[in-house]
């Protein structure tokens, strides 16, 4: 792992443990995951829709709202490099620059407002994949990103429903997307996306 603190040193972990430092001082992984799940679920229910105009600061605000009870660094961009399997996420030193550039592109596309469903799915898959590769936070990027795009979809007249999406298929689609093939991700989003108010 490379970071600004020295090779192999992860300041987010308790010394000698593979456990994230947390405000609850929990040092058992399963207990920490359960506490995080419960607390973020409560916080997620209180997050307001937010403005149409959104950028990296808005994504950081969502993360801070979700994880403020658990991590002191909630809402702060990560300062170490992280991986999922063999797939590296964006080098930490480039997150802010790349994230702002990506959000600028999203703004220039009008935050995907006014697109027909097929085009919305195509562009949503692109931006979702790009922000996933960015993975701006040490943990919790996925949940913050999901809420960010749920809000974006609502502003664009759509809604996202994640029910029935298998974790393995989702992870594989994101890995393929990181390698430049968005086909599987687009197929998943074609099922996830529906017009706002549309009943199943």
From Swiss-Prot:
Residues 54-195 form the Fido domain. ATP binds at residues 84-85, 140-142, 146, 172. It is an enzyme of class 2 (transferase). Gene3D superfamilies: Fido-like domain. InterPro entries: Fido, Fido-like_dom_sf. Keywords: ATP-binding, Nucleotide-binding, Nucleotidyltransferase, Transferase. Its EC number is 2.7.7.108. GO terms for biological process: regulation of cell division. The keyword Nucleotide-binding applies. It comes from the Bacteria. PROSITE patterns: FIDO. Disulfide bonds: none annotated. GO terms for molecular function: AMPylase activity; ATP binding. It catalyses: L-tyrosyl-[protein] + ATP = O-(5'-adenylyl)-L-tyrosyl-[protein] + diphosphate; L-threonyl-[protein] + ATP = 3-O-(5'-adenylyl)-L-threonyl-[protein] + diphosphate. Belongs to the fic family. Probable adenylyltransferase that mediates the addition of adenosine 5'-monophosphate (AMP) to specific residues of target proteins. Involved in cell filamentation induced by cyclic AMP. May have some role in cell division. This is Probable protein adenylyltransferase Fic.
